[in-house]
Amino acid sequence: QAMRDAVAATKVGFEAVIADLPRAVAGGRGERWVEGVFGLHARHEGNGIGYDSICASGDHANTLHWIKNTGDIRDGDLLLLDAGVEVDSLYTADITRTLPVNGTFTDAQREIYDAVYAAQQAGIAAVKPGNKFSDIHAAAIRVIAEHLHAWGLLPEGVSVEDTLDTEHGQYHRRWMVHGTSHHLGIDVHDCALATRVEYMDAELAPGMVLTVEPGLYFKADDLKAPERFRGNGVRIEDDVLVTADGCENLSAGMPRTADDVEEWIREVQSR
C-alpha cells in the first residue's frame, strides 16, 4: 500500500507540473520552475522528493541524470520528467513521463516515443514470477535494437542479433545507454549493492516492485542520428509489482501512449 500511496502522490505532482507548463515556458528557467512545482507537491503530499528530480527539456533529456535543471523550457521541446514522491513511510515512487511541452508531439518525436513505448511494453510483459530480472532488459532492448536497425542506424552489415551480442555487439548503446530496470522501495535503487547472482541473475518473485524504463536519446550534435531526431530524448518509466501470475503496473493511471499523453495534457490544462 505504501508504494500505491507514493505513486498516487507522484501523479498529483506530475499533473501540477502539466498544469503549470505554460508558465514554465513563459517565465524562463523553466526546468527550475518544474522542479519547484513538483517539489512543493511532493512535500505537501508526502515526506518530500524521493530523489533529485530530473526536469530535462530539449537536448538536456539526453544527459542521463540531468539534475542541474537550469535550462529554459521552449515551445516544441520534449520535457523528460523523472521524479517521485517519497511518502511518510519513506517508500518512494520513481516515474518518468516525456511530455510535449506544447501538448502535441511532432512526427519525429512521436516516432521515437512510439519505439520507446513498444520497448517498455515488451519489458513489462517479461515481468512475471520465474523470469530472471535480466529478462526485462533483454526483452526491452531487443525492441530498441529492432527500431534502430529499421531506421538504418546500426553499422552496415550489423543485424539485430549482432548488436545484442554482449561481447562483440552493443552498437545500440550509443542511443540507449542504461539498464531498463531496478528494484524499488525504501531506496529508489533498492538492493543496489546486491551481488549479480542475487540481483541481475535472480528470479522474480511475487511482491517485488521494480521499474521498467527504456529510453532513446539523440543528442543535438549527433551526426550519426537522423536530423529529425536530434535534440530529442525519450524515456518512459513505470513502477511494476510482480504478482502471482504476472505483474501489475502500479502507475498505469498515468497515461503512457502518445495519444493518451496528449489527451492528458489537454485535460489537465482545461481544469
Task: Describe the function of each predicted region.
Residues 1-271:
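Active-site neighborhoods and metal-handling regions in enzymes and metal-associated proteins
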